[in-house]
């Protein structure tokens, strides 16, 4: 591994690009704390009130809630088309922030594969979001549950769109970490989804040296967040090495389709190499 390869995919500063404005951010921050408190309060109230409603009602109300609290979600497809396009499929997305689940939960039929969450705040927020959106999740670390869920899904795939982030780590939006095939080779078609996030003040959503709670709070206090989800053409399910290539070659094709759409490189840098690089910076 070359450090230059990892550096390409990691932000090292909190503010990036021509629009960076740390002074304006500092002036905004006290008001941002109030915005964060309002967002959490509204989410708690909404989650309690919406529980008696159907999943479909929860989904559409959740989208309105996000808009109300300053989180905009747009897509190249309308709600019903997304539902048809992703039904029974694995939806593979690039991973760009600790808030990626916010827009994914607004999508029809969405079930998320969830890893560990670093902070208590993240766990509480995740609980509220899943309850409020009517979505389900599969815990990656619970192998017994995963085996059971995949067995059930194989028998009856209709009504579930499984959202995954095959990089298994967050990139800096200027390139993709290599996709892991174990997220994608599941006997179901794969729908690549190219996700982008726009933030004010030139904020970086994922500085490599920031803690999980710091990244979470910066996004929560941001005046606006704009996620855009572009659903790409479906890639047929993996069949065999003779027909689909090796599992890793299959995953590379999914990665390449997203990278090409976003106009960024699809690298072979792995999550493990990023973790090694970050650990080396702390020595």
Which functions belong to the PLM regions below?
Residues 1-89:
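Membrane-anchoring hydrophobic helices of lipid-metabolizing enzymes
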Residues 88-90, 110, 159-165, 189:
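Residue-level preference for the first positions of well-ordered beta-strands
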Residues 250-261:
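Short amphipathic C-terminal alpha-helix that caps PH/PH-like domains
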Residues 134-154, 165-169:
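A membrane-cytosol interface segment of integral membrane proteins
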Residues 42-47, 51-60, 67-68, 72, ...:
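Catalytic core of membrane glycerolipid acyltransferases/transacylases, capturing the structured
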Residues 77-85, 147-157:
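Short amphipathic alpha-helix with an adjacent loop that forms part of the alpha/beta core around
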Residues 1-16, 74-78, 101-102, 112-114, ...:
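Soluble, non-transmembrane catalytic domains of enzymes that act on hydrophobic metabolites at membranes
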Residues 124, 160, 172-245, 274-280:
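A cross-family acyltransferase "interaction/gating" segment
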